[in-house]
């Protein structure tokens, strides 16, 4: 039988004569005639105190049991006289699954730097900070699925291997075939064309939206950008909804509503974890998250955003001009100094956006939108898609891209075209927003970045 989780045990209303809990030892304290073990199983931030009395069957199993060891304990759940805890376990029996020699176990009872913990990513989840981060990550993912399910979206799966470049940026990982482990020769003959890891599931999601109405994909994406920044990783997760019969306003509404729903859910279900991060990682985190959901997001056209930036007379590293793609410093000024709130920028110049975005009537801008949030910058990027065949063909030619490569995408406009819209949400950036963490490497269980491919 599976053990009870500590979060379940701590929610008990009454004492129990027979409990079974498994976990990893955080601390061991010896006293005359008994031993205190602080046990954590990852189900919550809190530990459960386990008391082993001399003479019990469990006492004989204590040899070598220290911080890092994994055990199962069996005994009685009783009220605790200690401060800050309602319950403790009087242990009658203990099974030792694995020891951790203190002279080599890297996680001792002290603060470790994030840089050090990245080198032991396989163990860092056992710390309070990273346990909290990855519980919040899991809750955020579940909240996203629940939100879309309630909204009538279908969860779909799009290819990881692709022959097309959704973004047209060319920063893709090539996939080739090696005929044996010792073969230095590679081949593109498997598919008969070049194959890459996907940068986005958007184009395929559009196809399914044209028959299912509202869909979303939630999966890994890959960018071969040689960017060693706290905001970029080579492998990350994207949430990409697509909606038939939707325009730019619908898209902006969905982006705002989804973001707020996830924040509310995490604040509701993981307040202990958030409080820890508020104290040790990002002071003021709880207040910042509450402020985000307290009032509607600002909406500002690209033209107005550039005007605001020009009027600031700030000495930006990247000078502000119309036609500029907003940089991190511009996003930071808009969200943290000017609006002091999330802002959705819309109607961008077509020259700085992708081919599939719908051209506005002014023929100079497209119906694109970016959701910018304080401390993170761009969280979501999306658009109303170009549903008019002639306009889409013209734009593809204008950018010098291959019409033949997108024959299937163009078919959506030939056969029953419909206005539709969607966006991509960078899931790791959302987790950074929720946790106060400043480096994307610390919200990915096993980060993939330039020059680093451990685990």
Swiss-Prot record:
It is found in: Cytoplasm. Its main location: cytoplasm. GO terms for cellular component: cytoplasm. GO terms for biological process: asparaginyl-tRNA aminoacylation. Transmembrane segments: none annotated. The keyword Cell membrane does not apply. It is an enzyme of class 6 (ligase). It holds the Pfam family tRNA_anti-codon. Keywords: Aminoacyl-tRNA synthetase, ATP-binding, Cytoplasm, Ligase, Nucleotide-binding, Protein biosynthesis. InterPro entries: Aa-tRNA-synt_II (IPR004364), aa-tRNA-synth_II (IPR006195), aa-tRNA-synth_II/BPL/LPL (IPR045864), Asn-tRNA-ligase (IPR004522), Asp/Asn-tRNA-synth_IIb (IPR002312), NA-bd_OB-fold (IPR012340), NA-bd_OB_tRNA (IPR004365). Its EC number is 6.1.1.22. GO terms for molecular function: asparagine-tRNA ligase activity; ATP binding; nucleic acid binding. SUPFAM superfamilies: Class II aaRS and biotin synthetases, Nucleic acid-binding proteins. It catalyses: tRNA(Asn) + L-asparagine + ATP = L-asparaginyl-tRNA(Asn) + AMP + diphosphate + H(+). Disulfide bonds: none annotated. Belongs to the class-II aminoacyl-tRNA synthetase family. Homodimer. This is Asparagine--tRNA ligase.
């Amino acid at each position: 039988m599976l053990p009870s989780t500590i979060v379940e045990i701590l929610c008990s209303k009454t004492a129990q004569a027979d409990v079974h809990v498994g976990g990893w030892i955080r601390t061991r304290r010896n006293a005359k005639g008994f031993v205190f073990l602080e046990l954590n199983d990852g189900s919550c931030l809190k530990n459960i105190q386990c008391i082993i009395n001399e003479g019990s069957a469990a006492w004989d199993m204590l040899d070598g049991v220290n911080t890092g060891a994994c055990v199962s304990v069996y005994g009685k759940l009783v009220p605790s006289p200690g401060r800050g805890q309602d319950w403790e376990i009087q242990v009658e029996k203990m099974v030792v699954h694995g020891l951790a020699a203190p002279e080599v176990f890297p996680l001792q009872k002290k603060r470790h730097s994030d840089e050090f913990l990245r080198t032991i990513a396989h163990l860092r989840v056992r710390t309070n900070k990273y346990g909290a981060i990855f519980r919040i990550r899991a809750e955020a993912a579940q909240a996203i699925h629940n939100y879309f399910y309630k909204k009538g979206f279908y969860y779909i799966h799009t290819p990881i291997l692709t022959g097309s470049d959704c973004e047209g940026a060319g920063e893709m990982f090539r996939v080739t075939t090696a005929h044996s482990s010792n073969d230095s020769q590679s081949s593109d003959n498997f598919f008969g064309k070049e194959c890459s890891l996907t940068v986005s599931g958007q184009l395929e999601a559009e196809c399914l939206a044209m028959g299912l109405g509202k869909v979303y994909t939630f999966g890994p994406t890959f960018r071969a950008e040689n960017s060693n920044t706290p905001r970029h990783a080579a492998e990350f997760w994207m949430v990409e909804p697509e909606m038939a019969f939707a325009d730019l306003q619908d898209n902006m509404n969905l982006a705002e509503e989804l973001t707020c729903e996830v924040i509310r859910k995490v604040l509701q279900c993981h307040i202990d974890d958030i409080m820890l991060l508020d104290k040790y990682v990002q002071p003021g985190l709880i207040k910042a998250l509450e402020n985000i959901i307290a009032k509607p997001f600002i909406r500002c056209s690209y033209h107005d955003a550039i005007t605001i930036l020009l009027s600031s007379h700030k000495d930006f590293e990247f000078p502000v001009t119309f036609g500029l793609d907003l940089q991190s410093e511009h996003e930071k000024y808009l969200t943290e100094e000017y609006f002091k709130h999330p802002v959705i920028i819309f109607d961008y110049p077509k020259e700085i956006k992708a081919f599939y975005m719908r051209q506005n009537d002014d023929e100079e801008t497209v119906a694109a939108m970016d959701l910018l949030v304080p401390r993170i910058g761009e969280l979501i990027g999306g658009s109303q898609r170009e549903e008019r065949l002639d306009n889409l063909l013209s734009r593809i030619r204008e950018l010098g891209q291959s019409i033949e490569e997108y024959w299937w995408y163009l078919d959506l406009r030939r056969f029953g075209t419909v206005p539709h819209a969607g966006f991509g949400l960078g899931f790791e950036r959302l987790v950074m927003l929720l946790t106060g963490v400043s480096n994307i490497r610390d919200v990915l269980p096993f980060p993939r970045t330039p020059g680093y491919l451990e685990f």
